[in-house]
């Protein structure tokens, strides 16, 4: 895990996630679980994509649904992030991100909340749903971002997330910056 991520107790992480999502415990009937990510090694690009195989979580609960995602990012790339949006697949250009009805501006240092296109989505759908950020300027090789996605779930409250190599009780997914040809 990146040194940028500060260790928090599970209870503190969930409180922070609920605040980021604007929901209070017990009001939504769902649950909030944070997933950390680290991205690095970009080639020159004016927008980036973060993606990972969240479909593997479906093996723990095929009826698990995601309603909203809050994003908090730090690092050299994060300071220049603009609008962001989810899309099916990777064939996306800048104009699609700018014009997407569900796109939101990213405010550095603050959690930004984004509802999924079409409402709630099953976790297994995330094998083809990717998050795109526009950048002010370009990302270069060696730049990085680190942070957390806070996922608001519907489904079983007893999902057993896989442990990372350090034995953490939160799932740690590796993301990467990738040059996308518009």
From Swiss-Prot:
Chain segments annotated as coiled-coil in the UniProt record: none
Main localization, broad class: virion
Subcellular location: Virion
Highest taxon in the source lineage: Viruses
Listed GO MF terms: RNA binding
Region (Disordered): 1-25
GO cellular component, one term: ribonucleoprotein complex
Key words of the record: Capsid protein, Ribonucleoprotein, RNA-binding, T=3 icosahedral capsid protein, Viral nucleoprotein, Virion
Function summary: Capsid protein self-assembles to form a quasi-spherical capsid, about 26 nm, or bacilliform.
Full protein name: Capsid protein
Species of provenance: Olive latent virus 2 (isolate Italy)
Taxonomic lineage of the native organism: Viruses, Riboviria, Orthornavirae, Kitrinoviricota, Alsuviricetes
């Amino acid at each position: 895990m990146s040194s940028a991520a500060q260790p928090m107790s599970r209870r503190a992480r969930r409180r922070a996630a609920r605040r980021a999502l604007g929901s209070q415990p017990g009001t939504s009937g769902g649950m909030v679980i944070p997933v950390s990510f680290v991205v690095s090694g970009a080639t020159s690009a004016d927008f980036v994509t973060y993606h990972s195989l969240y479909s593997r979580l479906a093996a723990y609960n095929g009826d698990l649904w995601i309603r909203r995602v809050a994003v908090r990012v730090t690092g050299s790339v994060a300071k220049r992030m603009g609008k962001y949006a989810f899309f099916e697949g990777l064939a996306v250009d800048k104009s699609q991100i700018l014009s997407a009805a569900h796109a939101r501006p990213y405010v550095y240092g603050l959690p930004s909340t984004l509802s999924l296109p079409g409402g709630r989505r099953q976790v297994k759908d995330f094998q083809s749903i990717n998050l795109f950020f526009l950048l002010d300027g370009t990302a270069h090789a060696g730049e990085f971002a680190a942070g957390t996605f806070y996922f608001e779930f519907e489904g079983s409250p007893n999902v057993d997330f896989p442990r990372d190599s350090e034995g953490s009780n939160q799932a740690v997914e590796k993301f990467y910056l990738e040059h996308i040809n518009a």
